[in-house]
Amino acid sequence: LHLSFRRQRQMCIRDRFTRYGASVNTRELIAEEGGFIDDSISFNDDLPYFVNVKDKPWLVLPYSMETNDARFWRGGLVSTGDFYEYLKDTFDCLYEEGKTHPKMMSVGLHCRISGRPARSLAVEKFLGYVNNFPNVWIAPRIDIANWWLTNYSGLKQ
């Protein structure tokens, strides 16, 4: 297990863990393992929040399968236009809501799916669209977690 984590650290920005087969013990186990500062074993909110794990605050960055390119494989998306329109509509809704309450949009991308030529154009088009809006931050989840911990640590429960 530790060798696997070391190799993953060499190749990735951050450690990963299962989000799909999580058990009631997963959050405690990743908090104990060390090297993690958050988890995404949650689909219940638009913003990060803190929970208690063994009497310590733990950051949860909620995730969304709605805007994940895996929908090409599992059904729900047929064309790259479908993916772009869904991402754009989701962004537009959250951006409007974000005028009064902050929002976070997760977009799950996989090299083997959105790395394909036609699908990569949808991602490029979406990023171009989003970049035209003020007050939008496109960031990897680790940067969001670090920002949240720095700016909202006083809200830990």
List each model region and its residues.
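C-terminal domain-boundary segment and adjacent tail
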Residues: D38, K88-Q157
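Short, conserved active-site loop motifs that form the nucleotide-linked donor/cofactor pocket
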Residues: R9, W58, V136
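Single conserved hydrophobic/aromatic residue that forms the stacking wall/gate
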Residues: L1-I13
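Active-site-adjacent pocket scaffolds in enzyme catalytic domains
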Residues: R14-H101
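Flexible, glycine- and charge-enriched loops at secondary-structure boundaries
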Residues: H2, L77-T80, Y84, R116, ...
